[in-house]
């Protein structure tokens, strides 16, 4: 049967107890849903300030995401290594992995913080934004980058929590952080009383303050949870574990970096259409993320379970779990993206009353139906391959696809053929389809069974 569902496939016995797909999925979903909800609230508030401010913060955020990809290399690597070792019952090597990831992540983020804060404006000029938008984007980016060690440690420590089966910790901390950030943004934008932070720079400082408070909570949890980490036994040679972490994390990081750079280039292409096009993309992206987040949450949950299963050599269960979750994700993505298209105009009207933005935005929501259906393949198949330790193949496919399908055809369809944002969205659908289908057949080939770390 096409939609038969076997709950036992999503159940894994680990040293931390019995883990189920539901137990892992709900915290993943809540964390990303709440984070995006707060981002939507912030965008909603920022739109009252000006559409230019939305464009500036959105452009800087796009570049920031590219920088944060360096940190995801460590987070992804340590997650795969920990899942495989925990699944195999090899606890003694987990402390070395955690210790190495934290030390290397702190050092890397310190270097990036210095470089990016110095070269903030040149980085923003690469996005083809000008005038006040460029000034605000450079200011926002510089302030955020001065404290980029905060998201670096978030990514790494949250990956550690999730690998040990404690994703709910990330949910609570993320919720608190985003509520604090939204409250501070409200004070900055609406100034209900004289507040010392103002404008786009104030928004950037709000982000840093809320992340700083959250980091304190994260560090406390790291040392109070029953992770059985023996940091006092660590020696300089323990840092050699970073080689294993980078070996499995780097291909995924290169893939993510390539994707984020391509998205940055695409944003630059969209900027050629006009500033309103950037604002439209940001408004639409805020809405479609609520479809995106379901598939991504299920994909990340599947990756975690498959990592544990591969560590325990339960390959048949991992294989069937992937195919089952793929069906669920495609069904959910198709249904939700169609509903979003049907109710697109009133939802977009919450952000702007500009008739041109509303017209283009509604058209994009139609094309996004196809994007989300094929994105379902990517979320499940790519994350499953990475969870199994098969990281090189997805990297190659992703790099080839995002630059030929997404970037090249965004320029051809959007600029040369004059289709604007609609052309870019068609290119996005082509990219998702090419990657998703390739990942699917890679999983069916079962070559990933030979890629387990332990």
Where are these regions (language model features)?
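Short alpha-helical transmembrane segments in multi-pass integral membrane proteins
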Residues: 1-28, 82-149, 195-250, 306-371, ...
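Transmembrane helical elements of multi-pass membrane transporters/channels
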Residues: 23-42, 143, 177, 210-214, ...
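Transmembrane alpha-helix boundary and packing residues in multipass membrane permease domains
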Residues: 28, 32, 43-44, 61, ...
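Helix-terminus/linker motif at the lipid-water interface of multi-pass membrane proteins
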Residues: 33, 37-55, 124-131, 187-198, ...
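Small-residue-rich hydrophobic transmembrane alpha-helices
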Residues: 43, 54-114, 151-170, 267, ...
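Interfacial/gating helices of multi-pass transporter permease domains
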Residues: 46-65, 132-136, 200-202, 241-248, ...
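Short runs within selected transmembrane alpha-helices of multi-pass transporters and secretion channels
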Residues: 75, 144-163, 170-181, 203-218, ...
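Structural signal for membrane-spanning alpha-helices in multi-pass inner-membrane proteins
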Residues: 116, 159, 185, 189, ...
């Amino acid at each position: 049967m096409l939609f038969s569902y076997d709950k036992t496939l999503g159940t894994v016995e680990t040293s931390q107890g019995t883990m189920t797909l539901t137990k892992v999925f709900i915290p993943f979903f809540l964390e990303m849903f709440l984070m995006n909800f707060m981002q939507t609230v912030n965008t909603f508030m920022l739109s009252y300030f000006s559409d230019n401010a939305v464009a500036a913060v959105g452009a800087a955020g796009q570049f920031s995401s590219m920088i944060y990809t360096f940190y995801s290399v460590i987070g992804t690597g340590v997650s795969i290594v920990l899942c495989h070792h925990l699944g195999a019952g090899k606890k003694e090597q987990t402390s070395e992995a955690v210790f190495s990831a934290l030390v290397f992540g702190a050092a890397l983020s310190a270097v990036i913080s210095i470089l990016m804060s110095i070269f903030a404006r040149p980085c923003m000029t690469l996005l083809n934004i000008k005038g006040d938008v460029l000034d605000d984007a450079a200011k926002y980016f510089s302030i955020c980058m001065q404290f980029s060690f905060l998201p670096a440690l978030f990514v790494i420590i949250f990956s550690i929590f999730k690998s040990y089966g404690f994703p709910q910790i990330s949910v609570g901390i993320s919720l608190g952080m985003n509520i604090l950030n939204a409250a501070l943004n409200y004070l900055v934008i609406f100034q209900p009383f004289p507040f010392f932070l103002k404008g786009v720079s104030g928004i950037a400082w709000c982000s840093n303050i809320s992340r700083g408070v959250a980091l304190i909570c994260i560090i406390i949890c790291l040392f109070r949870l029953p992770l059985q980490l023996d940091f006092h036994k660590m020696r300089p040679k323990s840092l050699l574990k970073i080689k294993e972490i980078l070996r499995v994390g780097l291909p995924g990081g290169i893939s993510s970096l390539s994707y984020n750079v391509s998205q940055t280039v695409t944003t630059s292409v969209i900027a050629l259409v006009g500033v309103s096009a950037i604002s439209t993309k940001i408004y639409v992206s805020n809405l479609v993320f609520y479809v995106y987040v379901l598939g991504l949450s299920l994909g990340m949950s599947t990756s975690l379970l498959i990592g544990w299963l591969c560590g325990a050599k339960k390959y048949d269960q991992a294989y069937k779990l992937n195919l089952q979750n793929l069906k669920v994700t495609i069904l959910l993505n198709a249904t939700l993206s169609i509903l979003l298209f049907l109710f697109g105009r009133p939802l977009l009207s919450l952000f702007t009353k500009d008739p041109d933005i509303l017209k283009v935005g509604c058209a994009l929501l139609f094309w996004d139906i196809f994007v989300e259906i094929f994105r379902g393949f990517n979320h499940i198949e790519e994350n499953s391959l990475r969870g199994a330790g098969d990281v090189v193949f997805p990297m190659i496919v992703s790099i080839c696809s995002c630059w030929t399908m997404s970037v090249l055809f965004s320029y051809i369809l959007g600029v040369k053929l004059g289709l604007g944002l609609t052309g870019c969205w068609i290119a996005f659908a082509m990219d998702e389809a090419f990657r998703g289908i390739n990942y699917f057949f890679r999983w069916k080939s079962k070559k990933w069974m030979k890629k387990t770390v332990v």
